[in-house]
Structure formats: structure tokens, C-alpha cells
Amino acid sequence: MTRVHFIGIGGSGLSAIARLLKESGYQVTGSDKTLTPFAADLQAAGVTVYVGHHPRNVSGADWVVKSSAISDDNPEVRAALQAGIPVYKRSDFLGQLMTNKTGIAVAGTHGKTTTTAMIAWMLSALGRDPSFIVGGVMANYGVNARMGKGNAFVIEADEYDRMFLGLQPRIAVVTNLEHDHPDCYPTFEDMFSAFEQFIGLLPPDGTLIASSEDEGAASLLPRARKGGRHVVAYSLQGEMTINSPQWMQARSLKTNERGGFTFNASTNIAEAGVQSVSVSLQVPGEHNVRNALASLSVAAVMGLSLKNAAIALGEFKGTGRRFQVLGEK
């Protein structure tokens, strides 16, 4: 049995990959400075987790995967290289996992965790049984990753350290784009350039779905079109044909008794022409309406039932640490 060792297994990114490999039948071990909640969950699932980094931890491993936070001076990295064990960065390993899958990658400064989770839940409810990696624990599942039997692979595309440039998306979602991670991107232009490279990973028949309300995300639409790719713009209000012949728009927003918004989602993505479905979310905030529009756009691009997709989104319960209810008084 192939053994894969993860250095920095306690983070949301590596813990998710570790879970996928464990579910796929690999022997999985890992180490981190402390036993984080993610690491503890993996322990409960049968993964051996070492607290602290020591050369002996990699002994017998076939592959080693390291977090972007782990330097090449880490004792386990040095031991693996000296032993001739291949050491992969997270981004390189993720790209391999997505091979031969329909990759759906969600990027953006804000909202990517919830949007990734929404899409994963929606596709699951529609019977597609996707694999997914989310940067937080999904309330509907209680985990941040799962290896499904379907062809879709939904992944949160982390721009930190340009991780998302190792992915293989067929559908890319960009929620918004603001200057972040100045240690990686000294200027906004540096960050925007990385996002241009990200959408450049789409195949010629791939699709970019982006918010037309956000200047940074909307700026990517004409660039994707210039490359011949399909583009979809989404927003709460406004002219949807700007930069995109295909659109998804929310209209008639009203708060509902569950704490979220009820609204009509209209789109011209389907071959049948403009159609509209009613959506009633239980997760609060207009930002989640936007996240739902991105998710519905994915469903429309994949040719799935928008009515059933809307029902599934109404059952979405959110993700951990994102407006999470911790108790009631």
C-alpha cells in the first residue's frame, strides 16, 4: 500500500487532501506543530498524526506532500530529500488529483470557501456525487473534503503562493478580486496577473464565471473571451451583458423567516432561452445571494436542472467559522 506523508497536516488545505487519499485507500500519515481540530478529525478517521516534526516521521513514506507554510529547511523535508523520497508542494499534488476529472475551481479574495461548499453540496444533492476540497468544514457533511464517485471535482482555488496555478479547471469561478497577501503579491497588478494566469488554465472550451459587480473579477471576463472561452457574468442588479453574452441575475430580493434571502434567479445560459427559478436561502446576507448565483451558474453551464439546483441551495447550511451559529440564548 502506498504511503503518503503530509508535513503540515493540521491546516485546512493539507488535511483535505489527506482525507481524500485516506478514502481512496492510501496509507496516510502526517505531522504538525500542534494537534489542530482538522488533525484530530483525521486521527479519528484512522490517520496517524505526529505532533512535532522529526526526520523519523517520514521513514517508509513513498511520497511526501508539504504545506506552503513549510520551508525546505524543515527536518522532515530534508530527511525525505536525503532518502530520495519525492516531495511535492500542495499545488502540484492537487493538479494530479484533478486529472481526468471535470474540475470546478473557485477563486477570489472573499467568498470562495462558502461558494465552493455551495457548489459541492448542490452537485451532491443533484446526484453527481462530486469529489470536493473546501477551506472549511461543511455543515451539511461535517468534513472539509470527500472523494466522490462522480466525475466532478470541486475545489477551493487558493491564490496564496500561487497555489491555484497548479490546478486543472474546466470551470473557473471568480467571486471578487482585491489586493491581498502582500507577502506574495507586492502590488494589486501582481495579484491580477496571477489571476490572469489562473483563467489561462481553462481549456479552449472551458468557462469562466465571474461577478460583474466586482471590478477586478469583471475585468477577467473580456480576457477570457479573447481566448475563445465561454464566460458567464452574475450580479444582484445591473446590466448583465457587459463583458459577457451570458448572465445570471438575482431579482426581487426579500428576507425570509429562515434568516436568509428569497429571490428570483434569472439567466439566459440555457439553450431554451431566458428562464427563472425561485431560491430561498437559509444562510444570511446578500453576499450569499451572490455565492448562490455563482453556484446556479455552474449548474446551468453543466446542463443541470436549475429548479432542483435552487432547491438544493435552500438546504445548504453553511460552513464553519463563516457566520456560524455557536449557540442560542
Where do the protein language model's features map onto the residues?
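Gly/Ser/Thr-rich beta-alpha loop segments that engage phosphate groups in nucleotides
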Residues: 10-15, 32, 54, 110, ...
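N-terminal leader/targeting and accessory segments in enzymes
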Residues: 1-93, 215, 230, 249-254, ...
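Phosphate-binding loop of NTP-binding sites
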Residues: 20-23, 43-44, 57, 68-230, ...
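A short acidic, often aromatic-flanked loop/helix-cap motif at beta-alpha or helix-coil junctions
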Residues: 55-59, 93-97, 237-243, 258
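Adenine nucleotide phosphate-binding catalytic loops in nucleotide-utilizing enzymes
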Residues: 2-3, 7, 67, 185-192, ...
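Generic structural signal for helix capping and beta-alpha/helix-loop junctions
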Residues: 38, 59, 97, 140-141, ...
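Residues in the short beta-alpha loop(s) of Rossmann-like NAD(P)-binding domains
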Residues: 32-34, 136, 213-214, 237, ...
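A short, glycine/Asx- and small/polar-enriched loop/turn
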Residues: 59-62, 149-151, 246, 257-259
